[in-house]
């Protein structure tokens, strides 16, 4: 297992790397989000990006998809340096990606069929007969062909997530990006989504990035895992390698302990001094 951002770069052939995040630095306001962050996503594999809340996991996806630009370092996707691409080129690159967000983001005023058909109608000029075939095929793949005429309000959370997944794959993407796909799901729905992620990756020949803090779920499907903390990759390897790590940060994250390098309390003045100070201030007023 590697436990530094520099060492996290796997020695994979260039044509085997779909996304290469190299020595990236990124700030929001005066806050450093990433400092020399490096991650590689290899073709045909499921790569898990994990870390405590607020470590910038979703921000990394925004950088990869060109929604934000790095301050330093470089991100290449299929060999294209994102920072050098025009808006039109980034748009074209995104056509090769599918994205599944934690809230599903279904359009509430159209039915399931039209939600899945939406990207096809927006980005292609396919005949209606072919759109129908493609939509029903993708809905069948996620087990919801029979729900094509339902409205989003009639769906459970797990069903809505599956509809969103069908929509994400309807354009036959090469790279599928999942941002917190397990949030709010019951155990059965969670198991279904895990199964679909694995089967989609294998059956459709996809490359997948899964951002989540659900350690045990990711361990069942991920080929490669990166743990981000403090703006850097603190550990990388297979899920089994992370589980066997001796790093205090990794152990705390993997076990869910409140005792470790990631503090429970937000930085604050001395407790007693602050209480006494507030009390005296109140009396003076």
Give the positions of each predicted feature.
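ABC ATPase nucleotide-binding domains
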Residues: 255-285
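Catalytic Walker B motif of ABC-type/P-loop ATPase nucleotide-binding domains
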Residues: 176-179
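Conserved ABC ATPase "signature" region
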Residues: 81, 128-146
């Amino acid at each position: 297992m590697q436990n530094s951002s520099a060492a996290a770069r796997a020695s994979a052939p260039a044509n085997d790397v779909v996304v290469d995040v190299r020595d990236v630095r990124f700030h929001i306001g005066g806050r450093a989000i990433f400092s020399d962050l490096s991650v590689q996503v290899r073709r045909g594999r499921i790569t898990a990006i994990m870390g405590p809340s607020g470590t910038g996991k979703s921000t990394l996806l925004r950088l990869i998809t060109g929604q934000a630009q790095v301050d330093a370092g470089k991100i290449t996707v299929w060999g294209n340096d994102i920072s050098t691409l025009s808006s039109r080129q980034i748009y074209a690159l995104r056509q090769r990606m599918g994205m599944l967000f934690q809230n599903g983001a279904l359009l509430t005023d159209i039915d399931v069929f039209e939600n899945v058909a939406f990207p096809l109608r927006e980005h292609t000029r396919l005949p209606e007969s072919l759109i129908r075939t493609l939509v029903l095929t993708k809905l069948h793949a996620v087990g919801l062909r029979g729900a094509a005429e339902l409205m989003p309000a009639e769906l459970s959370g797990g069903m809505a997530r599956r509809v969103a997944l069908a929509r994400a794959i309807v354009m036959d993407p090469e790279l599928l990006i999942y941002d917190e796909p397990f949030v709010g799901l019951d155990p059965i729905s969670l198991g279904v989504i895990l199964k679909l992620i694995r089967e989609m990756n294998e059956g459709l020949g996809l490359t997948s990035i899964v951002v989540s803090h659900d350690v045990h779920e990711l361990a069942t499907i991920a080929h490669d895992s990166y743990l981000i903390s403090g703006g850097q990759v603190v550990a990388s390897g297979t899920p089994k390698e992370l589980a066997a790590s001796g790093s205090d940060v990794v152990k705390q994250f993997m076990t869910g302990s409140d005792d470790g390098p990631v503090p429970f309390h937000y930085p604050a003045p001395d407790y007693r001094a602050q209480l006494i100070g507030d009390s005296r201030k109140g009396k003076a007023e």
